[in-house]
Each structure stands twice: as C-alpha cells, then as structure tokens.
Amino acid sequence: MGKVDTNKKLKENSLLKTAFEFFTTKGFSKTSITDIVSKAGVAKGTFYLYFKDKYDIRNKLISHKSSQLFKKAIADLGDKLDALPFEEKIIKVSDHIINQLNENQSLLTFISKNLSWGVFKTAITSPVSDDDVDFSSIYEKLLSEAPKGIKDPEIMLFMIIELVSSTCYSAILYKEPCSLEKLKPYLYNNIRMMIAQHEGNTK
C-alpha cells in the first residue's frame, strides 16, 4: 500500500473510530457530521469521500464491528471448532460473540439498536476493511459441513440473529427475564431446534 493509500485508510479509520465514540456516548440522533469531522480533525468534504451520509458511516460501523466480533470468535476457538458437529459450531461461535458483547455493553447497545437484516446482509457480503473477515465464505463453508444439508439457510441465519440479539440485549443490560448464564441453555436449545427445522436436502 502506497503512502497516499495509507493516508486515506488512516483518515477513514479515524472517522469510523470517532463516529463510534459519538454514537455510543452522545447517541446516533444527536451526533452530527460536523461533530465527527471536528474531532477527527478532517474537513467535512473528506467525510464525503468515504461515506454518503451519517447513516452510511453507521451501517459501515455495524458491518465492521460485527466482523471484528466474528473474527475474534473464529480466531480464539481455532481448531476446537473442527471436531464439533455443525450445530455445535454455530453455538460455540454464538456463545463467544455473546460473551464479547457482555464484556462490551456499549457495543451491544450500538449493534442491537441499529442492526437490521438489510444492514447485516450487506455486512456479510461487503467487508468494510481489508482485515474484516469474509463472513459469507466462512458461513458457506459451515453450511457445507451440515451432514443433512440446510434448507433456506438465509431464513435460518436471520432467525438465529434476531433471537440472539433480542434475548441477550435484555439479559445482559437488564437481567430480564433472568441472568445471561441462566438464559444461555434455553437460548442454545432453541438454536438447535431452529437448525433441526432447516435440516434436509437442499436440492
């Protein structure tokens, strides 16, 4: 990467980092582009070289932060995943991500408040940063390891994400309807049932 490209990447990363700080402290609706560029130390015109508007930088942040969560889960679990059956791989990765969010509740709040299926679908197909994981290829590899095949995998993934996002948000932040640790066995049994509903020949 040349010096010009390096400088561009540094400016983009600075804008992303600054926007995340504002969104998780001041709130998305109360944060302006002027706030972001002033703290990042760049001109407003520079912002528009990288992002269309405030919604665009928010969506790219969700994509980037989600990728980082997934990347860390895969890296930390490593070879432990290889010996597990398909459904247990999904649960192990989910558990690791949930634990990360439990340790970073501002990130949990940001993602849960702003995550939509459209944003997530864009995230898994269009990595923001060069070091973001290619989620779609990893997910396709996981699906290929399901011994019975998976029918409508996009619906299955949507339902798992919605379930995990909504239930863990309440359990982590408000201990409702119970603590996270008490919730986990019920959550993972439901994920197993969801996967079982989608098992079958895909052809």
Model-derived regions, located:
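N-terminal intrinsically disordered/low-complexity leader segments
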Residues: M1-L10, E199-K203
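N-terminal positioning helix adjacent to the helix-turn-helix/winged-helix DNA-binding module
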Residues: V4, L10-S14, T18, M156
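Helix-turn-helix
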Residues: S14, F22-D56, K60
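Alpha-helical DNA-contacting segments of helix-turn-helix folds
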Residues: F51, R58-K72, I111, D131
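Hydrophobic alpha-helical connector segments
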Residues: K60, I74-E103, L157-I160
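Amphipathic alpha-helical segments used for helix-helix packing
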Residues: H96-T122, Y169-L173
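Amphipathic alpha-helical packing segments from all-alpha helical-bundle domains
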Residues: V119-P147, E154-F158, P185
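Hydrophobic/aromatic-rich alpha-helical bundle segments in the mid-to-C-terminal region
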Residues: S144-N190, N201-K203
